[in-house]
Structures are given as C-alpha cells and as structure tokens.
C-alpha cells in the first residue's frame, strides 16, 4: 500500500484500557439522498497507541491506516489534534 493512498481519519479517543491500544470513534456526516436530511454515523476503530504520541481518553486524534498489527488493529495514532480538557 502506497503512503499517499492510506486512509486518514479524525476522531475522539473513547477508551485506552487495552495495552498499547486506543478505541477511536470517528463521526461521518452525509445528506440522505431521498429525504435530504443530514445524517450522522459513528464507527469505532482500534488504533495503535504507543511511542511519542500517547493519547488519553477524550483527545481528538488523527489516525492513519497501516499494516495489520493484530486481529482488529489496522490504524495507528499519527498525531493529537486537541487534548481533552
């Protein structure tokens, strides 16, 4: 997979209970094709949380697609956009 083709998502860290792993909730908004109403969908991703970028619960982070790190982890935390208050 080429670096410029990797998925880049922004979400909120919901849990850091697992070792070296953070659960990140990503929100996607789109307009319903028939009813033209704004629809919000949420999806949770498991992301690798280790090294110089160590996220905590409530942080807004950017996650980047990477090679499979475990059975469920396909993303790593690239940077912290905003710390939790």
UniProtKB/Swiss-Prot annotation:
It comes from the Bacteria. Keywords: Ribonucleoprotein, Ribosomal protein, RNA-binding, rRNA-binding. The keyword Ribosomal protein applies. PROSITE patterns: RIBOSOMAL_S17. One of its GO terms (cellular component) is cytosolic small ribosomal subunit. One of its GO terms (molecular function) is structural constituent of ribosome. Pfam families: Ribosomal_S17 (PF00366). GO terms for biological process: translation. Belongs to the universal ribosomal protein uS17 family. Part of the 30S ribosomal subunit. HAMAP family: Ribosomal_uS17_B (MF_01345_B). One of the primary rRNA binding proteins, it binds specifically to the 5'-end of 16S ribosomal RNA. This is Small ribosomal subunit protein uS17. The gene is rpsQ.
């Amino acid at each position: 997979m080429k670096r410029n083709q990797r998925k880049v998502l922004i979400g909120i860290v919901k849990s850091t209970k697992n070792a070296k792993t953070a659960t990140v909730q990503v929100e996607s908004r789109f307009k319903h094709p028939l009813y033209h109403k704004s629809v919000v969908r949420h999806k949770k991703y498991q992301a690798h949380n280790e090294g110089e970028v160590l996220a905590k619960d409530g942080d807004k982070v950017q996650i980047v697609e990477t090679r499979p790190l475990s059975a469920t982890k396909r993303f790593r935390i690239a940077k912290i956009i905003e710390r939790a208050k």
